């Protein structure tokens, strides 16, 4: 499983900055793709704490890999072989009102919604599945190289992570690479980028096996903010080592921000606070 492979890597790295020996992503070379390096890499990112606004129930059987808010419900992608699903979840109860299961051979990963379609990645199978948003009926699939971790959209393109410091921008019609973003903070790589969410023109990314979310400028790749969620979930509520923070959802209409984790018993609506507030 992903958590066992990367725990030792994580323990040997500085929190958030990552290390140069993270999981390797096969190199892609296409005539159309370009690469964006963080020209703002020396900018000192703003630091944020949090305030809990509300607590919502969450299924402790949901190994959360992707979370999105739309039309008053959560869309959630879960992982683990034999347990991976795509769900529509009632936020008041935490129960799935509709779901589809992936074949046992697939380890589900991040999800995002673009128009009337939902895109779901898989970890190592090199497959992305496309579903009708209303029915959850699978309507297509794409193949890609390397691993799939997180995915989000700016409403036009798709952005995917693979556990390295890179975010790949993809054409939603073909899944082909349009460009690659290298994420940097103070000039150093930020590895282990996991679940992604597009918020206010930025990419927000969970940093796997940490309590931190980094806010990324999608043009330069520079980290412009760090959200520290240490203490959000009580240690006593975590049953396993890999019950880590993973899952960011945002309601642009109300600016409500939601976060959760793998097998957590709650989804938290939070507000950010600046350090010192």
List the predicted regions and their residue ranges.
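A short helix->beta-strand "capping" segment at the edge of beta-propeller domains
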Residues: 39-61, 91-96
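Bacterial signal peptide processing site
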Residues: 20-23
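Short loop/turn segments that connect beta-strands within beta-propeller blades
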Residues: 89-94, 132-136, 172-175, 217-221, ...
């Amino acid at each position: 499983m992903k958590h066992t492979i990367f725990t030792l890597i994580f323990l040997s790295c500085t929190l958030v900055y990552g290390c140069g020996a993270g999981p390797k992503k096969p190199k892609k070379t296409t005539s159309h793709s370009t690469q964006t390096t963080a020209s703002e890499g020396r900018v000192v990112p703003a630091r944020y704490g949090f305030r809990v606004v509300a607590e919502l129930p969450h299924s402790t059987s949901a190994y959360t890999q992707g979370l999105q808010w739309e039309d008053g419900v959560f869309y959630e992608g879960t992982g683990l072989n034999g347990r991976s699903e795509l769900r529509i979840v009632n936020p008041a109860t935490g129960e799935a009102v509709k779901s589809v299961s992936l074949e046992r051979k697939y380890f589900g990963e991040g999800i995002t919604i673009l128009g009337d379609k939902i895109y779901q990645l898989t970890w190592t199978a090199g497959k992305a599945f496309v579903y009708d948003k209303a029915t959850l009926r699978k309507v297509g699939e794409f193949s890609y190289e390397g691993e799939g971790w997180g995915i989000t959209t700016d409403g036009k393109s798709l952005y995917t992570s693979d556990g390295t410091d890179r975010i790949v921008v993809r054409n939603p019609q073909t899944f082909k690479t349009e460009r690659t973003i290298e994420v940097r903070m103070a000039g150093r790589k930020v590895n282990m980028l996991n679940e992604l969410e597009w918020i206010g023109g930025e990419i927000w990314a969970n940093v796997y096996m940490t309590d931190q979310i980094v806010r990324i400028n999608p043009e330069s790749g520079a980290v412009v903010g760090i959200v520290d969620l240490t203490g959000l979930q009580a240690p006593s509520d975590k049953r396993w080592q890999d019950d880590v923070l993973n899952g960011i959802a945002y309601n642009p209409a109300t600016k409500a921000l939601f976060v959760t984790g793998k097998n957590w018993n709650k989804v938290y609506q939070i507000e950010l606070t600046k350090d010192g507030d």
